[in-house]
Amino acid sequence: MVQTKRQKAIDLAVVPGKSYGIDEAIKILKTATKAKFIESVDVAIRLGVDVKKSDQQVRGSTLLPAGTGKAVRVAVFVPSGAKAEDALAAGADAVGMDDLAEKMQAGDLNYDVVIATPDAMRVVGKLGTLLGPRGLMPNPKVGTVSQNPGEAVKNAKSGQVRYRADKAGIIHCVIGKVSFDDEALKLNLQALLVDLIKIKPTASKGTYLQKVSLSSTMGPGVMIDQSTLSLK
């Protein structure tokens, strides 16, 4: 494929193995944007963990201060009553129990997040083969099993992201859009990293945040110099 002068310049701007200050990295990402749609900004974080060991698995959620820039559809399993009303008031797209489960079994799975109250898990448990492979199974570790579904819905709609270290010990997460202000992307990344530090497994030894790289949907990966971030 023939490269344009602009694309060649972008490729030359990113030196393999070099770490860039966060401000410069964001500018490179925005310069590299080439899709006809507004690209997402993704982060890949290599952790110093051995996920084969049960005490070194990392899973959690972060409420990004500037949101994700994405409209999120949320379904909530909760018995009828005040909590169901709270979930609807917070913007839930669907609320129910057995009736909602039946709709999902019939193919209505167009949701980004599924939330449940603890007493609704008896219903949700039957949907494991549907929700599990899609990453939608409610889990207390990421705030999707909650006694306060209204607050959980509000968080999901406001830009809460959920993540889990993969087999290689890498966290993949969206932290916004290239259309975001530079400062918004920076704050989102820092919030995510601070939360990851908080849930560092005690069994993890050595450097925990080994490598942090940003990329846009269609752009190159840019390694971040962590000393340019505020992680306190």
Swiss-Prot record:
The gene is rplA. HAMAP family: Ribosomal_uL1_B (MF_01318_B). It comes from Xylella fastidiosa (strain M12). Belongs to the universal ribosomal protein uL1 family. InterPro entries: Ribosom_uL1_bac-type, Ribosomal_uL1, Ribosomal_uL1-like, Ribosomal_uL1/biogenesis, Ribosomal_uL1_3-a/b-sand, Ribosomal_uL1_CS. The keyword S-adenosyl-L-methionine does not apply. Part of the 50S ribosomal subunit. Disulfide bonds: none annotated. One of its GO terms (biological process) is regulation of translation. The keyword RNA-binding applies. This is Large ribosomal subunit protein uL1. Transmembrane segments: none annotated. Binds directly to 23S rRNA. The L1 stalk is quite mobile in the ribosome, and is involved in E site tRNA release. One of its GO terms (cellular component) is cytosolic large ribosomal subunit. Keywords: Repressor, Ribonucleoprotein, Ribosomal protein, RNA-binding, rRNA-binding, Translation regulation, tRNA-binding.
